[in-house]
Amino acid sequence: MISASRAAAARLVGAAASRGPTAARHKDGWNGLSHEAFRIVSRRDYASEAIKGAVVGIDLGTTNSCVAVMEGKQAKVLENAEGARTTPSVVAFTSDGERLVGMPAKRQAVTNPNNTFYATKRLIGRRYDDPEVQKDIKNVPFKIVRASNGDAWVEAHGKLYSPSQIGAFVLMKMKETAENYLGHTAKNAVITVPAYFNDSQRQATKDAGQISGLNVLRVINEPTAAALAYGLDKSEDKIIAVYDLGGGTFDISILEIQKGVFEVKSTNGDTFLGGEDFDQALLRHIVKEFKRETGVDLTKDNMALQRVREAAEKAKCELSSSVQTDINLPYLTMDASGPKHLNMKLTRAQFEGIVTDLIRRTIAPCQKAMQDAEVSKSDIGEVILVGGMTRMPKVQQTVQDLFGRAPSKAVNPDEAVAIGAAIQGGVLAGDVTDVLLLDVTPLSLGIETLGGVFTNLSTETPLFQPRKVFSTAADGQTQVEIKVCQGEREMAGDNKLLGQFTLIGIPQPLVESLRLKLPFDIDANGIVHVSAKDKGTGREQQIVIQSSGGLSKDDIENMVKNAEKYAEEDRRKKVTTFSVNMAEGIIHDTETKMEEFKDQLPAEEVNFQNEGTLARKDSETGENIRQAASSLQQASLKLFEWHTKRYVG
């Protein structure tokens, strides 16, 4: 927690103060810190003493995920089992109960759209009634349902899964990738989240890590991680902007780098703006044009829509390097007149016109971030692009117009975040030194006060009059309900309710003059801790804000068990597959040799071996297949030894 580490931070930042005034600048404000000064601190002095083994850095993305580890002083991005450096954040469940993750899941999405989940990061930590969730329900082929706790979950084959569970399945794939490379178990991880994620979304991401079997040491902001990847080996002091337009979210962060000190000056963004929206906009355009030309409405055909969705994503990517592309989908659907084919040419200019409003939505957050950081575009020495959508030329031009300089391409937009997470893991393990990370909270924190007003704890006076005071008739005591919210709206009801707690034991005569001191801390994961203390009586109560409407401890434990069950099933499947491959190789070699020497082998032995071979091809378990293959191999060796002695020896 920051409160527990301020002394250590002061020592570190004090040393940095000689390097420049802004590296250690804290604005005067309540409790000595302003909203912008709630810091997340990390350096060797703050490294955990208990960390043993490698710490993997994971970018759990909306569209794709990536994992990296530190090798000495350099971060290395790891390839998955399919040989790719990024893994689609897609999870599917087949009709026979098999779970697929990554590219195997994405490949079968056309034939199984209702049970293939993608972009579920947009649902993580969200309530079913959220406007963004209601919008998503209309755009995806799979079912989004209301869970018993009011959260948005997904459904496949009658079973419900939380977005944290789906994220956990992807994290398990990342964990497996790391373990295959390291050669041993990977337990500790740093996971990234969008900078504009609220407390519930951060908690839900940590839940996903726990379900996957990872010990999540830290949750850090994606733009901050990208800045670490960019600036670790840079000696020049400068202010940079990180423009992060990924698959599902948009973040903009302004940072100052001074001799190893990475200070986030401000952050802003939109947690429901990304490549998925670009795909959806193009999909709507294609469906509209197809209906105009053929009279057929594709919106009721999930399989056809999935084909169009994949074609839209492919066309979007191609138009980043080409000025025109063709979209060809034969036999897309059919009506009474026969099959219908989709053939369409799409130019870059047409696509830019379709998504221009989405690109413009990134401008206001950038302007607000510069305003909050108290910098102008002339102060910014470098603009870093992160996220696959920043490959789009129109996005790059918008960034150049906005900041007055061509954006840098010094980092890989798909890998920078995972690299930064691995660097942060190295910091926590004590392997990376001379790095100090100072981050900010993305949204204001406060409480509900009289009239339902949202009172910002970081900018207002620390003494508040609570909205509700309850009296108990039995003993004349009172209890005070305190609601903690997060957001930027003026009324508490319009912001996110993080949690509530009660301060009890306040004498009745003091109610009218009751004033509470409400200090709060934000730990290194951006998770909120609040306490309330009555100035008159000294009564105090504390709360660690848990995900409002999120997963309970029992929920998480059950999901961990389910994840372990899937892991065991995956292990058995891997053993069976290996055994089948081995057996098929032995069968092929044996049959080839027996065919070659059948005239020189006893007929009854040839028939016996053939019968055994055919029978054992149908063995179901890996162990049975292995034993059958071994028996066949031994019998064949004896037979060919006999042949060698008789005809060769």
Swiss-Prot record:
Modified residue annotations for N6-malonyllysine: K206
Span list, region Interaction with NFS1: 1-432
GO cellular component, one term: cytoplasm
Region listing for Interdomain linker, in residue ranges: 432-441
Modified residues (N6-succinyllysine): K135, K138, K206, K300, K368, K394, K565, K598, K638
GO biological process: calcium import into the mitochondrion; erythrocyte differentiation; iron-sulfur cluster assembly; negative regulation of erythrocyte differentiation; negative regulation of hematopoietic stem cell differentiation; negative regulation of hemopoiesis; regulation of erythrocyte differentiation
MF (Gene Ontology): ATP binding; ATP hydrolysis activity; ATP-dependent protein folding chaperone; unfolded protein binding
Superkingdom of origin: Eukaryota
Presence of the UniProt keyword Nucleus in the record: yes
Class of enzymatic activity (EC top level): hydrolase
Cellular compartments annotated: Mitochondrion; Nucleus, Nucleolus; Cytoplasm; Mitochondrion matrix
CDD domains: ASKHA_NBD_HSP70_HSPA9
Entry binding sites for ADP: T63, N64, E313, K316, S320, G388, R391
SUPFAM superfamilies referenced in this protein's UniProt entry, alphabetically: Actin-like ATPase domain (SSF53067), Heat shock protein 70kD (HSP70), peptide-binding domain (SSF100920)
Catalysed reactions, as listed in the record: ATP + H2O = ADP + phosphate + H(+)
Function field: Mitochondrial chaperone that plays a key role in mitochondrial protein import, folding, and assembly. Plays an essential role in the protein quality control system, the correct folding of proteins, the re-folding of misfolded proteins, and the targeting of proteins for subsequent degradation. These processes are achieved through cycles of ATP binding, ATP hydrolysis, and ADP release, mediated by co-chaperones. In mitochondria, it associates with the TIM (translocase of the inner membrane) protein complex to assist in the import and folding of mitochondrial proteins.
Subunit composition and interactions: Interacts strongly with the intermediate form of FXN and weakly with its mature form. Interacts with HSCB. Associates with the mitochondrial contact site and cristae organizing system (MICOS) complex, composed of at least MICOS10/MIC10, CHCHD3/MIC19, CHCHD6/MIC25, APOOL/MIC27, IMMT/MIC60, APOO/MIC23/MIC26 and QIL1/MIC13. This complex was also known under the names MINOS or MitOS complex. The MICOS complex associates with mitochondrial outer membrane proteins SAMM50, MTX1, MTX2 and DNAJC11, mitochondrial inner membrane protein TMEM11 and with HSPA9.
Membership in a protein family: Belongs to the heat shock protein 70 family.
Entry remark concerning the domains of this protein: The N-terminal nucleotide binding domain (NBD) is responsible for binding and hydrolyzing ATP. The C-terminal substrate-binding domain (SBD) binds to the client/substrate proteins. The two domains are allosterically coupled so that, when ATP is bound to the NBD, the SBD binds relatively weakly to clients. When ADP is bound in the NBD, a conformational change enhances the affinity of the SBD for client proteins.
Name of this chain's protein: Stress-70 protein, mitochondrial
Organism: Canis lupus familiaris (Dog)
Lineage: Eukaryota, Metazoa, Chordata, Craniata, Vertebrata
